């Protein structure tokens, strides 16, 4: 069998460990910490604890320690941060087992020592019982002796010893317990530990002064204690009365308790907290009015009961004032070149947006003033509004704080609750400032268009004070009740729909619109950012899993339908997960993600995009739709049958598009002869206008020109080339009005096979947003009136 190692020796200071006694020790010396660190890995954790004679000795040798210690079981080892913060200290908990005599000791190796165990000796139980009677008169059995110990020393844990048998161990337990509780002097404690004879040990305890208790009756002893307590109480009362005149009873009791603590040299947790707060106020440049307010609240806190609700509320309020940044300021990076570099690194595409952001910030960086309007980024979900704000904060070296305003309907969420209310707290603005810890962060107000109003106030009204540069230097929060300067905060707001932003707020903001990403932009974002991030998260090398451009484009076209790239990223993650599973099964490490693998991993396509018809038919014309996720072709079908001149609209058309259809028909009727249509025909036929995709609601006026063309084509039987598409609102006088979403509509039409596009002349200024490689392959015809379209198509 392998030899069992001796327990190592741990030298302790200012404490003697007795058998049968539990203990806690803080371990901070380097040699001791190495010992405890090694002990953590052992199954049986035992140490021999010996006390050093001089507590100031850092590295005690054999002559510097007492040669009698205690073998102990170590039950718990707790790692705690050290004062230097570099290495960990330890706290150990355990229980003494048996006394040990050390006869030699090696400072180099704590396991090299000679020892033998010490056993207590018992001469006669009766003599010991008599000695115990001197301490505990009139007690018939051991349980009553322990009850007396409890009564005298107020230690309930001794009750569990009442079942210990009447033998040597019984007297060991009593004497060592008494010695640990009564003696504070290390020398006296060590003398008790080294004494083998239980009778002599007990006599030493009696000789310390506790024997006086054995010569007086229970009644006399009670009177003596009462007399001593009276003297102390009278002295305390006298002191309290000097300080009090006419105060309430609870204040009297608290003051009395404070004096008692002074008498016994004990400070409370509250006193420590108050002392720390006063120290911080002295050391830091808090504004004078804030110092005055904190000191006033501190007086209330000191004079309130620690268990009272008032004390908790006051302390929370003080902490809020202390934690708000009043003077702390980070140093901004005013380098515009660095701003451009960071924006280009973190965001593909968005060239117009980045240009506007740089222009907006360049002036503020030059003047070092934030007096201009607040930047508001508006766009569909997932196009990078929040990440753009983060990049701005990174480039300017500003702390980034985000507060989501979606669903906020209570003004108190912005301005805070009055601190007299139960559960009151500051508003989201000042909570964000507490998190920022500086007075000049970049503060993102996310989803500002999602706030609602209720009978609890108007949150948008509270935000006016926050966002107005002329007012926010004295922002008032109901909870703090002190003016707070927000003038150095750079606020950036985000929204999905500009029409949902309250007009008063919109007036204070510089709106920068982020449109949906094109397929080419999504491809670049995926290659530059998404794939790398997904592979890094899964700890996969880029050489092991390669994504082809064709594979990524296939995912974009047939598995996503979104303005941003969130769903696209989720699909990339799904492919990565399937790759890892396949790697575990087959061991195939290097894989190329092409179209075939995308189909295998993601199964059948989820979406499709509209493609033009191959054959031309009367009454069918390609419109162009602008959707929240981009754009698409909008085929319009018109047919006429014998009837009474009714207009039938199908395809889930909303109000605006229904009106546009009525206007289109009215224009055709008014100009029927110009279009070679018999005016009497309208009384004899019903015209049915249908837009395929009945499950999708369709709205907007931009299909007017296409509706007119489809009606003329149906009534005249003339076909329209399917390679043609058009967009533009029509008026009753035939003018083609400007529309929105030029970039998205043009890209989707090109994707669908269209090569000629009619659009309003006033939309020419938006064509520079369309990728040049698409524009060069298209014939874009700009028109003012519908007759320009008619002449090109039908003549």
UniProtKB/Swiss-Prot annotation:
The active site is at 702, 745. Keywords: ATP-binding, Cytoplasm, Hydrolase, Nucleotide-binding, Protease, Serine protease, Stress response. The keyword Signal does not apply. Residues 615-795 form the Lon proteolytic domain. Residues 7-213 form the Lon N-terminal domain. It holds the Pfam family Lon_lid. It comes from Mycoplasma pneumoniae (strain ATCC 29342 / M129 / Subtype 1) (Mycoplasmoides pneumoniae). This is Lon protease. Belongs to the peptidase S16 family. The gene is lon. InterPro entries: AAA+_ATPase, ATPase_AAA_core, Lon_bac, Lon_bac/euk-typ, Lon_lid, Lon_proteolytic, Lon_Prtase, Lon_prtase_N. ATP-dependent serine protease that mediates the selective degradation of mutant and abnormal proteins as well as certain short-lived regulatory proteins. Required for cellular homeostasis and for survival from DNA damage and developmental changes induced by stress. Degrades polypeptides processively to yield small peptide fragments that are 5 to 10 amino acids long. Binds to DNA in a double-stranded, site-specific manner. It is an enzyme of class 3 (hydrolase). It is found in: Cytoplasm. ATP binds at residues 379-386. It comes from the Bacteria. One of its GO terms (cellular component) is cytoplasm.
């Amino acid at each position: 069998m392998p030899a069992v190692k001796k327990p190592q020796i741990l030298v302790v200071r200012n404490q003697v460990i007795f058998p049968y006694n539990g203990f806690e020790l803080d371990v901070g010396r380097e040699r001791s910490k190495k010992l405890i660190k090694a002990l953590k890995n052992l199954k049986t954790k035992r140490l021999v604890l010996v006390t050093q004679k001089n507590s100031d000795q850092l590295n005690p040798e054999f002559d510097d320690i007492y040669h009698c210690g205690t073998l102990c079981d170590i039950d718990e080892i707790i790692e705690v941060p050290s004062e230097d913060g570099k290495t960990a200290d330890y706290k150990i908990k355990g229980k003494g087992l048996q006394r040990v005599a050390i006869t030699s000791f090696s400072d180099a190796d704590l396991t090299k020592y000679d020892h033998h165990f010490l056993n207590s000796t018992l001469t006669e139980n009766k003599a010991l019982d008599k000695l115990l009677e001197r301490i505990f008169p009139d007690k018939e059995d051991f349980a009553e002796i322990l009850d007396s110990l409890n009564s005298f020393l107020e230690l309930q844990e001794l009750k569990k010893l009442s079942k210990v048998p009447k033998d040597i161990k019984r007297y060991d337990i009593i004497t060592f317990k008494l010695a640990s509780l009564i003696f504070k002097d290390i020398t006296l404690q060590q003398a008790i530990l080294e004494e083998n004879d239980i009778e002599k040990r007990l006599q030493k305890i009696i000789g310390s002064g506790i024997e006086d208790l054995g010569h007086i009756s229970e009644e006399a002893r009670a009177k003596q204690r009462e007399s001593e307590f009276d003297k102390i109480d009278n002295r305390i009362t006298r002191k309290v009365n000097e300080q009090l005149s006419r105060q309430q009873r609870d204040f009297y009791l608290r003051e009395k308790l404070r004096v008692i603590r002074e008498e016994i040299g004990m400070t409370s947790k509250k006193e420590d907290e108050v002392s720390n707060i006063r120290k911080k106020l002295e050391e830091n440049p808090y504004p004078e009015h804030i110092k005055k307010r904190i000191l006033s609240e501190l007086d209330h806190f000191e004079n309130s009961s620690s268990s009272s609700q008032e004390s908790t509320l006051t302390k929370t309020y003080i902490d809020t004032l202390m934690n708000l940044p009043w003077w702390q300021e980070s140093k901004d990076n005013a380098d515009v070149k660095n701003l451009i570099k960071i924006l280009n690194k973190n965001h593909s595409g968005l060239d117009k947006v980045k240009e506007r952001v740089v222009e907006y910030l360049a002036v503020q960086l030059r003047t070092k003033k934030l007096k201009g309007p607040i930047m508001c980024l508006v766009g569909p979900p997932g196009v990078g509004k929040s990440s753009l704000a983060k990049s701005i904060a990174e480039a300017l070296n500003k702390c980034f704080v985000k507060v989501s305003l979606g669903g906020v309907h209570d003004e108190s969420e912005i301005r805070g609750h009055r601190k007299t209310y139960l559960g009151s707290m500051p508003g989201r603005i000042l909570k964000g400032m507490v998190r920022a810890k500086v007075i000049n962060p970049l503060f993102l107000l996310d989803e500002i268009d999602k706030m609602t109003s209720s009978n609890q106030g108007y949150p948008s009204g509270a935000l006016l004070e926050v966002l107005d540069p002329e007012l926010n230097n004295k922002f008032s929060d109901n909870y703090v009740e002190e003016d707070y300067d927000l003038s150095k905060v750079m606020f950036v707001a985000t929204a999905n729909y500009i029409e949902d932003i309250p007009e008063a707020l919109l007036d204070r903001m510089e709106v920068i619109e982020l449109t949906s990403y094109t397929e080419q932009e999504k491809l670049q974002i995926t290659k530059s950012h998404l794939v790398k991030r997904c592979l890094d998260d899964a700890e996969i090398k880029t050489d092991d899993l390669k994504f082809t451009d064709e594979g990524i484009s296939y995912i974009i076209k047939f598995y996503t339908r979104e303005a941003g790239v969130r769903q696209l990223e989720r699909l990339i993650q799904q492919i990565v997960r399937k790759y890892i599973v396949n790697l575990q099964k087959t061991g195939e490490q290097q894989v190329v993600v092409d179209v075939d693998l995308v189909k295998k991993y993601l199964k059948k396509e989820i979406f499709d995009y509209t493609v033009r018809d191959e054959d031309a038919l009367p009454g069918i014309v390609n419109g162009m739709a602008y959707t929240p996720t981009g754009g698409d072709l909008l085929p319009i079908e018109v047919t006429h049958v014998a009837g009474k001149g009714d207009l039938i609209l199908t395809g889930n058309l909303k109000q605006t598009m229904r009106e546009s259809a009525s206007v289109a028909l009215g224009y055709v009727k008014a100009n029927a002869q110009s279009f070679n249509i018999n005016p009497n025909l309208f009384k004899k036929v019903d015209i049915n206008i249908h837009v395929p995709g009945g499950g999708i609601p369709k709205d907007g006026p931009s299909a007017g020109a296409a509706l007119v063309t489809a009606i003329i084509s149906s009534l005249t039987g003339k076909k329209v080339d399917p390679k043609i598409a058009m967009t533009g609102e029509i008026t009753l006088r035939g003018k083609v009005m400007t529309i929105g979403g030029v970039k998205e509509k043009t890209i989707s039409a090109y994707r669908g096979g269209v090569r000629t596009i009619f659009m309003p002349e006033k939309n020419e200024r938006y064509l520079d947003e369309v990728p040049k490689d698409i524009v060069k392959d298209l014939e874009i015809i700009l028109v003012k009136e519908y007759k320009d379209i008619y002449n090109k198509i039908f003549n």
